[in-house]
Amino acid sequence: MFLVIGAILASALFVGLLLYHLKFKRLIDLISYMPGPPVLPLVGHGHHFIGKPPHEMVKKIFEFMETYSKDQVLKVWLGPELNVLMGNPKDVEVVLGTLRFNDKAGEYKALEPWLKEGLLVSRGRKWHKRRKIITPAFHFKILDQFVEVFEKGSRDLLRNMEQDRLKHGESGFSLYDWINLCTMDTICETAMGVSINAQSNADSEYVQAVKTISMVLHKRMFNILYRFDLTYMLTPLARAEKKALNVLHQFTEKIIVQRREELIREGSSQESSNDDADVGAKRKMAFLDILLQSTVDERPLSNLDIREEVDTFMFEGHDTTSSALMFFFYNIATHPEAQKKCFEEIRSVVGNDKSTPVSYELLNQLHYVDLCVKETLRMYPSVPLLGRKVLEDCEINGKLIPAGTNIGISPLYLGRREELFSEPNSFKPERFDVVTTAEKLNPYAYIPFSAGPRNCIGQKFAMLEIKAIVANVLRHYEVDFVGDSSEPPVLIAELILRTKEPLMFKVRERVY
């Protein structure tokens, strides 16, 4: 009996290995035409990444593309997993410009325990329906109301910066921690309509849970040792993730239930109008309110549906904005002439009274600040790598891409290609001035918010928040970089772009 069972299991194992071998051999044969670095058995190119410090990943991707790619296309094997890196805007347009490649790459699975099937990771009909529902949340009338929240968060940020200015003086301090708490405050209030006061209570359970889950996501997505669920679930990191997820999900769920009950009591549970004249006009609405008053196929969204999207909004609008702001202040601190122009524009538009709120209309008049933000996002895109999964064999501009391939597109690499941007390592905000520049920009060469149908739905929100915080900081302080400005920061391209070492700044109060 046991011999029979053993024979059956051995046969099944043999058949499974044979099928896997044939599938793997097919991949190798189909992609044999594409250039790539020399490979090792079993690990492929994994030895270039396993056990190496995170900042080496950026160098390695640039090195591979510059050394081995042909027409800006390159294959990279991570074990049996085939990845194709693309750096040609024409190829990028095919991948991002249609819904043919709508599925995110496998690395995004690490987000599912927190975001479930929120807009970032959902696909197909569910993604299309949710996108349609969420779009009105970024209508200009609602964005106008969010500026009040940005103003409040900026005031708390200035208070903390002043404390550090007095405490550290010329030695400087890291702006990132305060900026990160500021964006957490603003995103939480705009998403859920509640204040968590992260800037005054950084040790709260919710704030710590957000920090924990961000750390977990970085490690899971870019450490091959945490990629496999069976082994990952046995690690202390998995236990920390579970604890943090319980805090985050319970907090969001509680707010959803409370707000749904409030709307019922107010008699306002009808579907909100999407008409331009009505959206956001009646009351200050949080992102949560839009979802609570929305329907899919004439049915209201469940609490789980809403939690997925609120958590996604929290995730997408928190660390990304912090990263953009940190690199913005680095750029203008190391380019005093640009900082001077930003300050003069802000003072000209907003006036000399530092207590004057910076309104939506005023923010839209900050044209040079806008150019500096765009140039910062070219050099330091908050999301340095985008991924798509190929579900069936296809051709992209004559190149055969087999089913099962992960396509990698790096906004960071695209933004530093000399063929696309003159002097790509130089901070030149004027290159984005469509009135004065002769430089013609391929729309798929500059993709800090991705591009196409799955572009970042909140990019106008993000730009508005960045400019609001910048305007408030620069009219109060002159920002100087503490360090060697001749050496660019060493970058770590994880889920969100960051630096190997914290960027340190000192600030001087502006008197006028």
Swiss-Prot record:
Annotated residues that bind heme are located at 316, 456
Gene3D superfamilies reported in the protein's UniProt record: Cytochrome P450 (1.10.630.10)
From what organism does this protein derive?
A: Drosophila melanogaster (Fruit fly)
Q: How does it sit in the membrane?
A: Peripheral membrane protein
Please state where this protein is localized.
Endoplasmic reticulum membrane; Microsome membrane
Q: Name one GO cellular component term.
A: endoplasmic reticulum membrane
Query: Which is a Pfam family this sequence falls into?
Result: p450
Record's protein name = Cytochrome P450 4d1
